[in-house]
């Protein structure tokens, strides 16, 4: 599907980023079905991204990256997701974390430079990935607030961490996790803290618990910390609740929503190709693309995608041009429309293709499962609707 220029890559840099993503997507697509079935991480595509510098896009230019903007990753991640959604999701989380930390300036320069330089220099294997590890069995979504059950106790010249983190996306291939914990220092009240924890830290282990409907290859297993010791310097500053960082988090979430847009685009491509090639005997050699009901469904697919991509990309471009806290509702709307329209596209594609879309070997069946994960990224629909209502009525 082709889009008018504002909704696709416009600058030479944007085109280059999309081409890097497509190079990895092409490799990853050949292995996506196997990794989905076996719940293994798509290392083949990740190796391409490590080699071509995609993993360091959001690192500042002064540290060897490209200072990529939200729009760059929206365009790149949607292209990457057409090959393998699980790979794209983990890479999107990595890039978004680096981007929002860079833009909001919430870490110390020493912390950020240490991570950034390793990210841009790791050009082989699985590269150097980072992700936020915040979810817990009893806590629910971290975006809803609450103090973690995971603890970090100040002891001597370091911290001792104990707890469990669920939804640890990319766990098998991460170099670091930013672990949220309740920090205990002496008799003082515990406070919410974040810790930059190397995944090689003794006392840290991964329980292979990830067995889900969709996004099966993300390796989002349970991380167990049992007397895991880190240096005193591992604590990274956490922004205050409701601070200036929040709009940056919302803005960079668009680069994650773009993954689900890309999955929907892959579902659309499969359905359109099927319609053009399917020639039942009853049609005397004509393809089903000539049937009015099929053409109606094809039109619905593209209408939904134009809506989703148009709002997502235009909102990202608006943010990059003039970041503002006043855009919170627009950012939420772009995410919600992208994730819900993506689900609608996958469902419409299955209706167009018919019963064969249910085959476990069909990429469309995988797209249908993967795309549903978009509902569970913040802001979830109910939080977005509450925001819209507050702005309209209060």
Please identify what each model-predicted range represents.
Residues 19-22, 262, 292, 299, ...:
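Generic structural signal for well-ordered, non-transmembrane alpha-helical segments
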Residues 8, 12-15, 255, 285, ...:
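Register-specific recognition of a single heptad position within extended alpha-helical repeats
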Residues 166-171, 252-255, 374-377:
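Glycine-rich phosphate/pyrophosphate-binding beta-alpha loops
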Residues 164-205:
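A short core secondary-structure module
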Residues 211-304:
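Glycine-rich beta->alpha junctions and the first turn(s) of the following alpha-helix
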Residues 43, 47-50, 57-164, 169:
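Glycine-rich flavin
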Residues 355-394:
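Glycine-rich phosphate/cofactor-binding loops in nucleotide/flavin-utilizing enzymes
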Residues 33-36, 306-337, 350-358:
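C-terminal helix-coil-helix/basic helical segment that borders enzyme active sites and/or dimer interfaces
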